[in-house]
Every structure is written in C-alpha cells, then in structure tokens.
Amino acid sequence: MSEEITNGAAAPVDAATGPAFTVEKIYVKDVSFESPNAPTIFNDQVQPELQLNLNQQVQRLGENAFEVVLAVTLTCQAGERTAYVAEVKQAGVFGLVGLDPQSIDVLLGTQCPNILFPYVRQLISDLIQAGGFPPFFLQPINFEGLYAETLRQRQEQGDAPSLADSEPAGNA
C-alpha cells in the first residue's frame, strides 16, 4: 500500500494514526518598510541604534488547525532621526492532531515560531538592503526560553488561558 505525495507536500494525516504536527502553509501576512529621512540619512555619520520588538499571536482556525503569526518590528535610529522601520508579520497554519492541550501549547509557543523565524530573518534583511542600508541579520531567538517565561507569568497570574484555548475563527 502506498500513499501518493504531490509537489513535496506531506500526506494527509488520519487522526486514527496517532498524534501529528504538520505545517500546512507558510505565508507573509504583512510587510512594511519606511525610510522617512532618505536620502539625506545616507550621509549621516552617526552610530545607529536598533530596537527590536517581537510578538507572537495564535488563533485557532478549527478543531485541529492554528494560525501562528510571528511579528517583528526593527527600528533604526540615527541620532534624533529615524533611518528605517522594517515590519514583518510571517504566518503559518499548523495542524495539531491527537495531542493533549499542554503539548499543543508547547508546540504553538516554541516549534511554530522556530519554523517561522528563518522566513522573518530573510525578509527583514532583504527589506533593509532594498532600502539602501547595510544588511542586518536577526540573531537566533530562544523561543523555548520565551515560552518558559510566558508560562511562569501565566502561573503567577493564576492560570491565564493557554495558546491552545483560543476560539476558532469564523463567523459567529
């Protein structure tokens, strides 16, 4: 018995075969680049200061499907002036079948952003270079550590809802 797999996609997983974690789709949800002081900013000899903001959002799409969005904003200041602002929202749809809520929460908080991060890194670097600035490479992020910190904060607040507890999206 054989299963046909087309164009490199994973074969559908039957819930009866056991737990499964699948990447259904990866896509850019939003992208923006602004350089409000170009072209005069290119002549500045000021050491730039960078500020990185990272955010993750999870939305349940169905019983076994979740959208995870990894949002990154990188702001570069040259003295009092903004050199650029690069924003990327990289998203993925992930299938999680036959897993307990705690395992789902861990996967949504660690593995999903780890899968999306290389796409974010590449997009940020490409945007900045296309804007006429030297490349910037986002350094690896310890999503496991961030998840552990989030979990600790949730416990301090009295069991706030997990990532897997969100309601399915759609028309109500």
Curated annotation (Swiss-Prot):
Listed under GO cellular component are:
cytoplasm
Top-level taxon:
Bacteria
Is Heme there in the keyword field? no
What SUPFAM superfamilies does this protein map onto? SecB-like
Which Gene Ontology terms describe the biological processes this protein takes part in?
protein folding; protein tetramerization; protein transport
As for subcellular location, the record says: Cytoplasm
Cystine residue pairs: none
Keywords attached to this Swiss-Prot or TrEMBL record, sorted alphabetically, are: Chaperone, Cytoplasm, Protein transport, Translocation, Transport
Q: Which GO terms describe its molecular function?
A: unfolded protein binding
Q: What does this protein do?
A: One of the proteins required for the normal export of preproteins out of the cell cytoplasm. It is a molecular chaperone that binds to a subset of precursor proteins, maintaining them in a translocation-competent state. It also specifically binds to its receptor SecA.
**What interactions and quaternary structure are annotated?**
Homotetramer, a dimer of dimers. One homotetramer interacts with 1 SecA dimer.
Protein name (record): Protein-export protein SecB
